[in-house]
Structure formats: structure tokens, C-alpha cells
UniProtKB/Swiss-Prot annotation:
Family the UniProt entry places it in: Belongs to the peptidase M17 family.
Record text on cofactor binding: Binds 2 manganese ions per subunit.
Protein name: Probable cytosol aminopeptidase
GO cellular component, one term: cytoplasm
Catalysed reaction equations from the record: Release of an N-terminal amino acid, Xaa-|-Yaa-, in which Xaa is preferably Leu, but may be other amino acids including Pro although not Arg or Lys, and Yaa may be Pro. Amino acid amides and methyl esters are also readily hydrolyzed, but rates on arylamides are exceedingly low; Release of an N-terminal amino acid, preferentially leucine, but not glutamic or aspartic acids
Active site residues of this protein: 274, 348
Sequence positions that bind Mn(2+) 1: 267, 344, 346
InterPro entries linked to this entry: Leucine_aapep/pepB, Macro_dom-like, Peptidase_M17_C, Peptidase_M17_leu_NH2_pept, Peptidase_M17_N
């Protein structure tokens, strides 16, 4: 964890921490904790705000030192923007801004009082849970492969959260741990995070907790199951594939929820080789797998009273003389044959076998998560995942969960009129659908392997990682999925 978290009910003026975090609205109205500090300092905070020494616009932070009558040597004032517009997004931004302001420097411990604020259509427990997940996300530092590069070890280590709801704190910490677990896997370079490494890491986590278990299928076992589609993608790589199966048994005899995550640990594109200007980011093509593993971590840590199964086909799409080719016809585990139109449309080829495998668990609901198409990113950008399902109830559950935690998805159609774009002369289905509607035709392809399931597909190509040299894995949609499971456990 990037941070350690505690609950704190001390009066702000007497809290024994390095820094107190309070807020101020654009109209110069102080948050309740800020009012308490203002009273303790005999109006000092009000005076500083009035003369413009403390900014109140959204995104601003002002660090004050030695406020009279306040035990903490520092007070961080966070701008909250207009009071009438204050809601979910401004609250989450304020928490993140505060954490980033204290990420480096002399402050080791802080008390976050922003949880006392009223957020429209949310309760105090939500405030605490989201404060934990957002602040841990903001404080995250990647260090796994830095070698001799110096890491700034100063800054915030412990964040006390104003409030008394221990369960809300525990769920927030569990979710944050799941997000961070997923981000760490996603950020690792592909020479580290191979299919075997991903499998070993997931199994090692499951082995630490009663009620959790892992099964790792190797190439021979997958071949015996008839997973010809998945294994075709794996043929060109020296890093052999694994099928990761994780189980959390928290719900007695109830049917499990099943998450399937695309785990392409690096995607060259295969024979249809990717070009420079994007291939260097293809280590993130396993983020669907990383994020369903992260959701498993959150579920186990929160001890949710449900049954959960996670399935991750972990494969590297590489090139050698044995690599699969465009125009190959391969046979999936379902028995359906697939004509390969493009070897860079490999995610759906590993997912179709994993989805077929998942049927054996008799899922209450089946959701796959994948960085599946650039087309989804073109359509929706980096702000939202794409959601496809023929089951309105399931789609609405996922959409509501995403809205609740601001890890949102947007529903795209999955109409039968698109299915004809996948017709093949030489096989049951073609693995690409042409230039138009690429995200939707990818979803249509997967729908052919989930016909008897209550199923939804999340295309996370736009939200799984930040772009550019300094970009990192985001851990999305661990928040959405964890909230969805929390709702099912309620």
C-alpha cells in the first residue's frame, strides 16, 4: 500500500499529526473543520482567506504553517470550488489534490477532514471509502525496476481519516489494495511480467488466505481441453501460456460471479505487426487480467459474502516461424471454427476459450474485461469504458456501480445487425468485422461464445492506462467491479 490509513475522531485543533487537511469553497465559506481551526486561531484562517492568501478555486492547495491555537504545525487548505456545484467529482478531486500536495516533503502524517463534507446523493461511509481509494491512488509510486535510481522517500506515509465507520475504512482499504495490486502488475515491463509470472503472483496471493484458492493450467492441460484458439495466439512466443483460475468461497452454496480478464502480457500484433507509435505501450494489454485479479484481491481483503471466480488467459502474442497467420482456421474450445483475418485481433481469440471454460462454474453473471479495441478508445476516449451486453439488468447494475464510484462505463449497442460483419466463407466466424464499429463487432464476436450466459463485456482500452512516456496503469475498472460485487453482497 502507498499509504497506511486510520480513523480519527479528534478535534481538528488538537489532533497530533503533522498536517490537518481542510477545505474552503469559492465563496470563502470554510469547511466545518476549517471553521474549528479558525475559531482556535481567533479568526486567523478567515483573515488569510479574505486577503487572498488562501486560494479557494478547484484544484488549489495552500500550506499554512504554525496556525495559532492549532496543535498540528501545518494546515493544508484545499480549494473546493463553487458550493452549489460540489458533488462526487469535486470531492474526489479535492482528496486527490490534497494527497498529491503532501506526497513529498516533510509531512509524514496527516488528518483528512474532507470526509465531513456533504456530497450529493452519497453517505458518510462512501466518503470514507472513496477518500481511501483516491488518496492511495494519488500517493502510489512505482519502484519495482528503478535499480539505482534514487527514490524520494519523504512525504506522506499515514493518512488519518475523519470519521468512525470502521467497516467503511476496511472496504476502502481493501479496494485500494486491489487497485494497487492491479497497477503494479500492469506497470511491470513484459520481460518481468510474463504469463508464468502473472500466474505465480496470483497464486501466491490466493495461497495466503483461507477461503481463497488458485488453479494454474499449463499448455498441456489447455490442449486437453481443446483450447485451440487461445493456444494459436501463444504459438509464436517463447513465454508459454497459462490459464489462471482464482476462487473466493465466501458465499456458501450460491452461484459464483465470474470475471474473465484478457491477459496478453505483451502484444506485438503477431504477423500483423504493430508499428512504432503504440507498440511500446502494449505491456498494458494484460490490464484486463490484472484488473480482475485486483478485484479478486479487493474481494478477498474485504471478505465479501459472495462466491467469485476469476479466469485469466495469460498469453504473449509474439512472432516466430510457428506463429499463427492471417487466413488460418482454428478451432475453439466451444467447437466453433474461427478464420483469422488479423493476428492483432488476438484478445478475442484468447477470451473466447476462457469464456467457454467459465461456463463450467454455472455463473450467476459473467463479465469479461479487456483492453480489446482501439476503436473503443476512439469512440469514448479515456474518460469511460465501453460496456456491451444483451442483458439490460446486468448492464444497468454495472453502469450504476461505475457511476457510484466515478469509475464509469458507457453502453454501446450489441445489435444482431452487426453480426453479419463477422461472417466467414471458410469458418463459423471471422475474427474481425471490418473498418467500422470495431468495438461493437469485437463484442459481437465474444457474444457468440456466451449465448447461454448472463454476460457483459467491458472494453477498457481507453481507461486501463495513461498515455505517454509518464503514463501508468490506472487500475480501472477495479473500483467499478468491486462496487458491483459489494452491491451483490448487500
Amino acid at each position: 500500500m502507498a499509504l497506511q490509513f486510520t480513523l480519527n475522531q479528534d478535534a481538528p485543533a488538537s489532533a497530533a499529526v503533522d498536517c490537518i487537511v481542510v477545505g474552503v469553497f469559492a465563496d470563502k465559506t470554510l469547511s466545518p473543520a476549517a471553521q474549528a481551526l479558525d475559531s482556535a486561531s481567533q479568526g486567523r484562517l478567515t483573515a488569510l482567506v479574505a486577503r487572498g492568501d488562501v486560494a479557494s478555486k478547484t484544484g488549489s492547495t495552500t500550506l499554512l504553517h504554525d496556525l495559532p491555537g492549532v496543535t498540528a504545525p501545518r494546515v493544508l487548505v484545499v480549494g473546493l470550488g463553487e458550493a452549489g456545484k460540489f458533488g462526487v467529482a469535486p470531492y474526489l478531486k479535492a482528496v486527490g489534490d490534497a494527497t498529491r500536495a503532501l506526497k513529498t516533503g516533510a509531512v509524514g502524517t496527516a488528518l483528512l477532514t474532507l470526509t465531513e463534507l456533504t456530497v450529493k446523493a452519497r453517505d458518510a461511509a462512501w466518503n470514507i471509502r472513496q477518500a481511501v481509494t483516491v488518496s492511495d491512488h494519488a500517493a502510489y509510486r512505482y519502484t519495482a525496476t528503478l535499480g539505482k535510481k534514487k527514490v524520494d522517500e519523504t512525504g506522506l506515509t499515514t493518512l488519518a481519516i475523519a470519521g468512525d465507520d470502521a467497516r467503511a475504512l476496511a472496504v476502502g482499504v481493501a479496494t485500494a489494495e486491489g487497485v494497487e495490486f492491479a497497477r503494479e502488475l500492469g506497470n511491470l515491463p513484459p520481460n518481468y511480467c510474463t504469463p508464468a509470472y502473472l500466474a505465480d503472483t496470483a497464486a501466491a496471493f490466493a495461497g495466503k488466505f483461507r477461503g481463497a484458492e488458485a488453479e494454474i493450467l499449463d499448455e498441456a492441460q489447455m490442449e486437453a481441453l481443446g483450447m485451440g484458439s487461445l493456444l494459436s495466439v501463444a504459438r509464436g512466443s517463447a513465454n508459454r501460456p497459462r490459464l489462471i483460475v482464482l476462487k473466493w468461497n465466501g458465499g456458501g452454496d450460491a452461484r459464483p460471479y465470474v470475471l474473465v480478464g484478457k491477459g496478453i502480457t505483451f502484444d506485438t500484433g503477431g504477423v500483423n505487426l504493430k508499428t512504432q507509435g503504440g507498440i511500446e505501450e502494449m505491456k498494458y494489454d494484460m490490464c484486463g487480467g490484472a484488473n480482475v485479479i485486483g478485484t479478486f484481491v479487493a474481494t478477498v481483503k474485504a471478505e465479501l459474502p459472495i462466491n467469485l471466480v476469476v479466469v485469466v488467459p495469460a498469453v504473449e502474442n509474439a512472432i516466430d516461424g510457428n506463429a499463427y497467420r492471417p487466413s488460418d482456421v482454428i478451432t475453439s474450445m466451444s467447437g466453433k471454427t474461427i478464420e483469422v483475418g488479423n493476428t492483432d485481433a488476438e484478445g478475442r481469440l484468447i477470451l473466447c476459450d476462457a469464456l467457454t471454460y467459465a461456463e463450467r462454474f454455472n455463473p450467476e453473471a459473467l463479465v469479461d474485461v479487456a483492453t480489446l479495441t482501439g476503436a473503443c478508445m476512439v469512440a469514448l476516449g479515456h474518460q469511460t469504458a465501453g460496456l456491451m451486453s444483451k442483458h439490460d439488468d446486468l448492464a444497468n447494475e454495472l453502469l450504476a456501480a461505475g457511476e457510484h464510484v466515478f469509475d464509469r462505463a458507457w453502453r454501446l449497442p450489441l445489435w444482431d445487425e452487426y453480426q453479419g460483419l463477422l461472417d466467414s466463407t471458410f469458418a463459423d466466424v471471422y475474427n474481425i468485422g471490418g473498418r467500422w464499429g470495431g468495438a461493437i463487432t469485437a463484442g459481437c464476436f465474444l457474444s457468440r461464445f456466451t449465448e447461454n450466459q448472463r454476460w457483459a463485456h467491458l472494453d477498457i482500452a481507453g481507461v486501463a492506462s495513461d498515455e505517454g512516456k509518464r503514463g501508468m496503469a490506472t487500475g480501472r475498472p477495479v473500483g467499478l467491479l468491486t462496487q458491483w460485487l459489494l452491491d451483490r453482497a448487500a
